[in-house]
Amino acid sequence: MTRKVKAAIIGSGNIGTDLMIKILRHGQHIEMGAMVGIDPASDGLARAQRMGVAITHEGVEGLTRLPVFNEIDVVFDATSAGAHVKNEALLRERKPGLRMIDLTPAAIGPYCIPVVNGDDHLDATNVNMVTCGGQATIPMVAAVSRVAKVHYAEIIASISSKSAGPGTRANIDEFTETTSKAIEVVGGAAKGKAIIVLNPAEPPLMMRDTVYTLSDFADIDQIEESVQRMADAVQAYVPGYRLKQRVQFDRIEADCPIRIPGVGDRMNGLKTSIFLEVEGAAHYLPAYAGNLDIMTSAALRTAEKLAERLLASLVA
């Protein structure tokens, strides 16, 4: 039987529960060790228990008291930015070698977008998965960046209000700050801006994302081809990820410049507009929750690579 790395998930809400189901169904080098929550009545803990996963409703302290804790090598944190700082400190003290995959906007460790820099931080003890909006849009910014210098990138992530749990709602400010920074650090834009919209529409709408970039003038065919290749790469682990329509281009000439607050008063260049839709796999919430699916799929993709590295080191 193939050896697997045991993982614990902190946070038994929407994201944590969806991730658990993905690991149980599709984990190749990762297997569930424990599900951690703070609400003994949470649906996530109840599901985990029914599926034979060790549980605790006593938070990370409870995790350290579980017999399986000694076997845990990877911990996913699907709580909140503030909670992750405390969880990281406590677990790092108890088990310094733990690998933590942070699904909150805390960003203690380096940003990780699997299709852009997924192999760059496999030895880091803590990696940050940015945000759902970041996972959907930063690959597109990077796709433009590898063709032309991007001076400014702005993303708007629209998600169904029903798919946003208390953790997401508590982290709106952190969402915009972390995503904006990652657009620059990982996406390659000189300046980034992120906006999130919680859409209350009924029936719930799928996740929609819009990406605008202002870059140096470049061959639009090359940009379009780069964007399509990147979309295909994301689709390899998020099947519901797709371009909603063809990429649009506008030339902003020097004799008719635009003003971008905080960036420049007389900007010109090539404006690229990319429109995305993310349909979820419906492992936990229905298919409209693509924001859930892209975040947990990216986290699992990252964990599989970390696990491969850990298992290879044991063999060596």
UniProtKB/Swiss-Prot annotation:
Q: Which reaction does it catalyse?
A: acetaldehyde + NAD(+) + CoA = acetyl-CoA + NADH + H(+)
The UniProt record gives the binding positions of NAD(+) as 12-15, 163-171, 291
**Entries under InterPro entries matching the protein:** Acetaldehyde_dehydrogenase, Acetylaldehyde_DH_C, NAD(P)-bd_dom_sf, Semialdehyde_DH_NAD-bd
One Pfam family recorded for the sequence: Semialdhyde_dh
Please name the HAMAP family in this protein's record: Ac_ald_DH_ac (MF_01657)
Task: Extract the NCBIfam families matched here.
Answer: ac_ald_DH_ac, PRK08300.1
**Keywords of this entry:** Aromatic hydrocarbons catabolism, NAD, Oxidoreductase
Protein family membership = Belongs to the acetaldehyde dehydrogenase family.
Q: What is its EC number?
A: 1.2.1.10
Q: What class of enzyme is it?
A: oxidoreductase
Gene3D superfamilies according to UniProt: Dihydrodipicolinate Reductase, domain 2, NAD(P)-binding Rossmann-like Domain
Q: Which GO terms describe its biological process?
A: catabolic process
Active site (UniProt): 132
Q: Please list the GO terms describing molecular function.
A: acetaldehyde dehydrogenase (acetylating) activity; NAD binding
Q: What is this protein called?
A: Acetaldehyde dehydrogenase 1
User: Species name for this entry?
Assistant: Pseudomonas putida (strain ATCC 700007 / DSM 6899 / JCM 31910 / BCRC 17059 / LMG 24140 / F1)
Q: SUPFAM superfamilies under this entry? A: Glyceraldehyde-3-phosphate dehydrogenase-like, C-terminal domain, NAD(P)-binding Rossmann-fold domains
